Amino acid sequence: MDMWKFFDITHREHILCNPMSLEKLDQLITLLRLKHGARVLEIATGKGEFIIRLAERYRQMTGTGIDFSPYCIAEVRKKHQTRVPDAQLSFLEMDGAEYLPETLESFDLAACIGASWIYGGHRGTLNALYRMATPESWIVVGEPYWRHEPEGEYLEAIGVTRSDFGTHYQNVEVGREHGLEAVYTLVSSQDDWDKYEGLQWYAAETWASDHQNDPDVETVLKRVRENKTAYLRWGRETLGW
């Protein structure tokens, strides 16, 4: 089935499409202290809660949000018009990896939160954002990390390899390779993770009940239930973010 349809179904109850609380997001936004007229780029903007909240707090910023999902782009454009209609924001439906700004090193904040697969991993993401950000800018990323060594069965179940993610410390060290220094980190709590995962189960089951004739019902339920088993059996104790 269409991957964006699947993502839209399983995240229809989410405000944030990652395992982070709104309180932590607001804390981050407060710490950024964007200057007047700051230029912001968010790759994989999702439902756009981060960039919309930035615009609500920093009214004089301009922002560009990129996402490949037509569902997400439609939702974030609606948020823009209802919550910050006067904000200078634009949203592009495209592959983030193909986005190139008119001028490199032009953004005061460059972000890709929870979608490093776009650039082939954490290192590739930092490299891409680094090239688009000004020397004194903020770079914001969200990346999984191993809390302890993952079991082989878990890796097979979720379709990743051990080398796809590092430890929390290793994620920071990759930044240092680019001359970046981590000044703050937000780590998802068990409650953050349980809410993120649990809302997917709820969304899938309620959607399936309401759309019993949809040809993708079986696919959605099978995938979500398999992911639920992997999370409860291994992921809850193994994967951080």
PLM features: residue spans?
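A short glycine-rich, Lys/Arg-flanked "PGG" loop and its adjoining helix->strand segment in the class I
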Residues: 123-138
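Conserved class I S-adenosyl-L-methionine
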Residues: 37-46
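A short SAM/SAH-binding and catalytic strip from SAM-dependent methyltransferases
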Residues: 109-121
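Conserved alpha-helix/loop element of class I SAM-dependent methyltransferases that forms part
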Residues: 18-36
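Short, glycine-/aromatic-enriched active-site segment of Class I SAM-dependent methyltransferases
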Residues: 141-162
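Conserved Class I S-adenosyl-L-methionine
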Residues: 184-241
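A short acidic, Gly/Pro-enriched loop at the edge of an enzyme's catalytic core
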Residues: 101-110
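Class I SAM-dependent methyltransferase SAM/SAH-binding core
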Residues: 49-98
